[in-house]
């Protein structure tokens, strides 16, 4: 039997409640389908700070490095607003990304048919929307040096951030995008600002060269990032996979997420490079939503983003494509039946809590897996 190791980091706020619903799915898959998941759990964020004085302990970091995949809930809350900057809850997430070398952030923007009316765009523009934004996560202006504020001595200050990309960073993120496109609609749109940024010129060149060398079967289009943002809200279904840098990816993925009408339901994945010996990638999966401390502990949080993150884990870390597809279909079926948590409640639907929503998805998944 294949052994698949999962390390769960529920975190703070609604993270633990949402993770409980994923545990139900894992337990079912192990008992009914001999999936072979081994599960361990650790602390991250504010809960780790309360227990260990840091946002993630070295011991839990070792467990994360050893796992096949990590499921991450959410971190943060007003309780920890006064902790030292280096120990703030978000530092745990940043350390995970850094130490695991997770350079590729995958942000799907999927519009479930039952929620199309909740989008800020006309339903016909977004119904059936399925975009995947591949964002470079460890380079660019967020990490480039120098990064500082200088006192110019004349009553003025100067803020400096540096956008830096090396060839290998662009090659590897482009390769991820092209490979993912092959399992989708086989189209990639690369976005940068080559008209005003030298890093954009290099980005365009390297993506073009990578495409010509290895991925000629994939359709490639280039678009300036500002034009890309406009096209996302004008005609979003023209896109399949979008690949872009850290800064533009941060912005464009949030724009795309809002097209779905359900920002709090979207998953994400962060991937590292394949291991030279095993071919496996380090990977972490997490919902896009935050810790929502205002509703934590009230059993009203929506667990769908966490469940959908587990579906991404099945697909990308364990190549359990059939199971991932069925789990995603189970979510859609539940929504089609009018079952809703408070955040997505609509007229004519039935409101349920966190556990009941998780149970409804599990029941649909069982029916599809029978």
UniProtKB/Swiss-Prot annotation:
The keyword Transport does not apply. Binds 1 Mg(2+) or Mn(2+) ion per subunit. One of its GO terms (cellular component) is cytosol. One of its GO terms (molecular function) is magnesium ion binding. It catalyses: (2R,3S)-3-isopropylmalate + NAD(+) = 4-methyl-2-oxopentanoate + CO2 + NADH. Its main location: cytoplasm. Keywords: Amino-acid biosynthesis, Branched-chain amino acid biosynthesis, Cytoplasm, Leucine biosynthesis, Magnesium, Manganese, Metal-binding, NAD, Oxidoreductase. Its EC number is 1.1.1.85. The keyword Oxidoreductase applies. Its cofactor is Mg(2+); Mn(2+). It comes from the Bacteria. Substrate binds at residues 97, 107, 135, 226. The record marks 142, 193 as: Important for catalysis. NAD(+) binds at residues 77-90, 290-302. Pfam families: Iso_dh (PF00180). It is found in: Cytoplasm. PANTHER family: 3-ISOPROPYLMALATE DEHYDROGENASE. Belongs to the isocitrate and isopropylmalate dehydrogenases family. LeuB type 1 subfamily. Homodimer. Catalyzes the oxidation of 3-carboxy-2-hydroxy-4-methylpentanoate (3-isopropylmalate) to 3-carboxy-4-methyl-2-oxopentanoate. The product decarboxylates to 4-methyl-2 oxopentanoate. This is 3-isopropylmalate dehydrogenase. It comes from Agrobacterium fabrum (strain C58 / ATCC 33970). The gene is leuB.
């Amino acid at each position: 039997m294949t052994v698949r190791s999962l390390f769960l980091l529920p975190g703070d706020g609604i993270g633990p409640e949402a993770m409980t619903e994923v545990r139900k799915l894992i337990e079912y898959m192990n008992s009914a389908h001999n999936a072979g998941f081994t599960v361990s759990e650790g602390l991250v964020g504010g809960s780790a700070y309360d227990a260990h004085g840091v946002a993630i302990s070295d011991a839990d970091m070792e467990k994360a490095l050893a796992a096949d995949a990590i499921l991450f809930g959410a971190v943060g809350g007003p309780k920890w607003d006064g902790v030292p900057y280096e120990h703030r809850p978000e530092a745990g997430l940043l350390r995970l990304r850094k130490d695991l070398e997770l350079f590729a952030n995958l942000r799907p923007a999927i519009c479930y048919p039952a929620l199309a009316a909740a989008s800020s765009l006309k339903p016909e523009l977004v119904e059936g929307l399925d975009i995947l934004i591949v964002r470079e996560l460890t380079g660019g202006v967020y990490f480039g040096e120098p990064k500082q504020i200088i006192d110019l001595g004349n009553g003025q200050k100067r803020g400096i951030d540096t956008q830096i990309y090396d060839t290998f960073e662009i090659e590897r993120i482009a390769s991820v995008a092209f490979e993912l496109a092959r399992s989708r609609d086989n189209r990639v749109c690369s976005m940068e600002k080559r008209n005003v940024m030298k890093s954009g010129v290099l980005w365009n060149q390297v993506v073009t060269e990578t495409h010509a060398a290895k991925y000629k079967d994939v359709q490639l289009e280039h678009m300036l990032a500002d034009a890309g943002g406009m096209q996302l809200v004008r005609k979003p279904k023209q896109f399949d996979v979008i690949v872009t840098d850290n800064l533009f990816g941060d912005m464009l993925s949030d724009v795309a997420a809002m097209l779905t009408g359900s920002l709090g339901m979207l998953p994400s994945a962060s991937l590292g490079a394949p291991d030279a010996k095993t071919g496996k990638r380090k990977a972490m999966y997490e919902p896009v939503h935050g810790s929502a401390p205002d509703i934590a502990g009230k059993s009203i949080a929506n667990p769908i983003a966490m469940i959908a993150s587990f579906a991404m884990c099945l697909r990308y870390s364990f190549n359990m494509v059939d199971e991932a597809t069925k789990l995603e279909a189970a979510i859609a079926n539940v929504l089609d039946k009018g079952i809703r948590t408070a955040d997505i409640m609509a007229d004519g639907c039935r409101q349920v809590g966190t556990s009941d929503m998780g149970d409804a998805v599990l029941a649909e998944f069982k029916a599809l897996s029978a």
